[in-house]
């Protein structure tokens, strides 16, 4: 650590560490460190030249110290970079969280403003809210002011209180009657216990008899079950026995026909095997014969070639000898004669060569090597021609005889057309036609069955859809034939007591019998009437305002669904407006938990079901 380079690096590193506080400063430090490194590298040879007598020990120590300083500075820079990234991520997360809080507060502010406007609208708003909530009271509250609506509701409330008091009175009477019946039951049980204690033998006998009776009943049920199974088996076997004879005959005929076919195939197979063996033997004999003939021809050709070569050499020697003799004694006249003789000799040799070529082609065509054999072959061609002419005449006579036989057989076939065999053939053809028609009819039946199945499925889907729609529209009452349960003008409560109720006219799905043939048309008519009534009721409402409200809700739900997965919802302890239909028992979940979209849908569904149940109970009461 005694080198000036180390002191310079240390002095430059200390202010750089003090200056690092932000990501921009980190980059500045990195820029500042680069010249120091290059400067240090440039100073090393100078220091070495100045202190060359000290040896390489001081130089190596200086380099290691500089490297350590640089490595330490790099680690610090990396730590500062990590701190910068963490600070940036935490800042972004705080920004997103604050943005979510702002959006939530805006939504709550909008809801509170809507509630405030709803509260400031007065009596007309109250009347409209009551009409929307209680559709059964709509005809009575439609054209009334707030005070008149309150008076009407007070009157109805007094009626309901009176009915409640009457029901409570009936409940007290029923409870007293129930207590009396329980007392009588306990007395009867005491009497039975005393009888069992006094007559133990009789009780044992009764229990034994009951056990035997139960066993006999179980055995009888099992016997009935076994009897029914055996009867089913008997009916199935009887039905099978009706077609068993025909099936056995058909199967026997099939077996006989298959046996005949098998025998014929065995014969054909044996003939084919014999023909194959004969063909193999003939092929082997022909191959051996051809091989021997080829060997013979090759030997003869080699001998002929040798003889031709020898003759050629002899001719060449004779020509050279004659040429030498003629050269010594030639003259002009003798030269012309020799030229003429040479031309004659060349023509003779050319004709001999052509004859040899033709003879070679004839030998190749006939497969014979000797000249006299070729001559015999050509002479034998005449005998072969005459023999072929004889065979031709014989074949023509045979063909004429076969044609006459064919005409005779054709005439016999024409005569046998109306015999038993011809009738059998016609019956077989007719059977084939009927089978074809049967297949066509079966195909038509299968198509009709498929179409019927599709129609039944469509009808079932339509029925289920209409029943579902009718269930949704069950709270709507339409005009129809009157129905009575019990006495006129009275209805039974859950305990079975009769209470005075106004006679109600209307139709509902529960009063229709699904087993009736006209159930589906009646259900369709009922649903149509309810939909028309619902449409007439919707005409009195502000439909664009309702649609705008629904579109706003869907828009907010879409925005909520597009939030990223890492977005966390923070529940703020804000006291919200409690609904008058809010059920405390169904909202016992912890408010600190994160409410997901699925949980919110489940809560809203439960709230809607609780409201519909309360409305149904209020209508039934």
From Swiss-Prot:
Coiled-coil residues: 61-325, 386-470
Cited InterPro entries: ODAD3 (IPR033192)
Keyword Lipid metabolism annotated: no
Keywords associated with the record: Cell projection, Cilium biogenesis/degradation, Coiled coil, Cytoplasm, Cytoskeleton
GO CC, alphabetical: axoneme; centriole; ciliary basal body; ciliary rootlet; ciliary tip; cilium; outer dynein arm docking complex
First-listed, main subcellular location of the protein, grouped into a coarse class: cytoplasm
Region (Disordered): 484-514
One GO BP: cilium movement
Amino acid composition bias (Polar residues), ranges on this chain: 494-506
Location(s), subcellular: Cytoplasm, Cytoskeleton, Cilium basal body; Cytoplasm, Cytoskeleton, Microtubule organizing center, Centrosome, Centriole; Cytoplasm, Cytoskeleton, Cilium axoneme
Tissues of expression: Expressed in trachea multiciliated cells.
Highest taxon, organism lineage: Eukaryota
Assembly: Component of the outer dynein arm-docking complex along with ODAD1, ODAD2, ODAD4 and CLXN. Interacts with ODAD1. Interacts with PIERCE1 and PIERCE2; the interactions link the outer dynein arms docking complex (ODA-DC) to the internal microtubule inner proteins (MIP) in cilium axoneme.
Function: Component of the outer dynein arm-docking complex (ODA-DC) that mediates outer dynein arms (ODA) binding onto the doublet microtubule. Involved in mediating assembly of both ODAs and their axonemal docking complex onto ciliary microtubules.
Name this polypeptide is given: Outer dynein arm-docking complex subunit 3
């Amino acid at each position: 650590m005694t080198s000036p380079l180390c002191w310079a690096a240390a002095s430059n590193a200390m202010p750089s560490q003090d200056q690092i506080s932000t990501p921009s400063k980190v980059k500045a430090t990195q820029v500042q460190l680069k010249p120091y490194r290059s400067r240090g590298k440039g100073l090393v040879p100078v220091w070495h030249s100045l202190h060359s007598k000290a040896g390489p020990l001081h130089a190596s120590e200086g380099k290691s110290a500089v490297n350590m300083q640089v490595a330490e500075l790099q680690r610090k820079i990396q730590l500062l970079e990590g701190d910068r990234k963490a600070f940036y991520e935490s800042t972004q997360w705080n920004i997103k969280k604050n943005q979510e809080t702002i959006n939530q507060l805006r939504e709550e502010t909008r809801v509170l403003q809507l509630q405030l406007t709803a509260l400031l609208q007065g009596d007309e708003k109250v009347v409209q809210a009551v009409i929307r909530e209680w559709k059964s009271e709509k005809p009575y509250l439609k054209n009334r002011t707030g005070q008149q609506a309150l008076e009407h509701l007070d009157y109805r409330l007094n009626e309901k209180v009176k009915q409640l008091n009457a029901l409570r009175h009936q409940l007290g009477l029923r409870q007293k009657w129930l207590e009396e019946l329980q007392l009588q039951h306990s007395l009867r049980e005491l009497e039975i216990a005393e009888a069992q204690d006094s007559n133990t033998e009789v009780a044992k006998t009764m229990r034994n008899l009951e056990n035997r009776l139960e066993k006999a009943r179980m055995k009888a049920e099992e016997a009935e079950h076994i009897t029914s199974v055996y009867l089913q088996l008997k009916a199935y076997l009887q039905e099978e026995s009706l077609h068993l004879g025909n099936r056995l005959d058909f199967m026997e005929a099939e077996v006989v026909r298959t046996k005949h076919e098998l025998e014929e195939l065995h014969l054909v197979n044996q003939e084919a095997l014999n023909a194959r063996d004969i063909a193999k033997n003939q092929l082997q004999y022909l191959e051996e014969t051809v091989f021997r003939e080829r060997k013979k021809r090759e030997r003869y050709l080699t001998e002929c070639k040798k003889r031709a070569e020898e003759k050629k050499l002899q001719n060449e020697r004779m020509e050279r000898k004659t040429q030498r003799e003629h050269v010594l004694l030639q003259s002009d006249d003798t030269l012309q004669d020799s030229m003429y003789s040479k031309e004659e000799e060349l023509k003779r040799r050319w004709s001999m060569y052509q004859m040899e070529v033709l003879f070679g082609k004839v030998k190749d065509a006939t497969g014979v090597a000797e000249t006299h054999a070729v001559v015999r072959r050509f002479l034998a061609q005449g005998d072969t021609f005459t023999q072929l002419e004889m065979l031709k005449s014989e074949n023509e006579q045979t063909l004429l005889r076969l044609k006459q036989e064919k005409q005779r057989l054709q005439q016999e076939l024409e005569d046998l057309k109306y015999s038993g065999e011809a009738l059998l053939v016609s019956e077989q053809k007719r059977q084939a036609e009927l089978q074809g028609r049967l297949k066509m009819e079966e195909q038509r039946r299968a198509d009709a069955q498929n179409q019927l199945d599709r129609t039944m499925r469509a009808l079932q889907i339509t029925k289920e859809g209409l029943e579902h729609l009718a269930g949704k529209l069950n709270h709507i009452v339409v005009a129809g034939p009157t129905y009575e349960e019990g006495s006129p003008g009275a209805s039974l409560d859950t305990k079975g007591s009769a209470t005075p109720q106004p006679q109600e006219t209307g139709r509902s799905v529960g009063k229709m019998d699904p087993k009736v043939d006209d159930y589906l048309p009646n259900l369709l008519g009922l649903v149509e009437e309810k939909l028309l009534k619902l449409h007439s009721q919707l005409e009195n409402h502000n439909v664009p305002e309702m649609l705008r409200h629904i579109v706003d809700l869907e828009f907010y739900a879409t925005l909520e669904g597009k939030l990223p997965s890492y977005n966390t919802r923070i529940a703020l302890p804000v006291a919200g407006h409690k609904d008058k239909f809010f059920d405390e028992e169904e909202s016992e979940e912890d408010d600190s938990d994160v409410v997901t979209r699925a949980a919110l849908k489940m809560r809203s569904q439960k709230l809607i079901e609780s409201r519909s149940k309360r409305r149904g109970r209020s209508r039934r009461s």
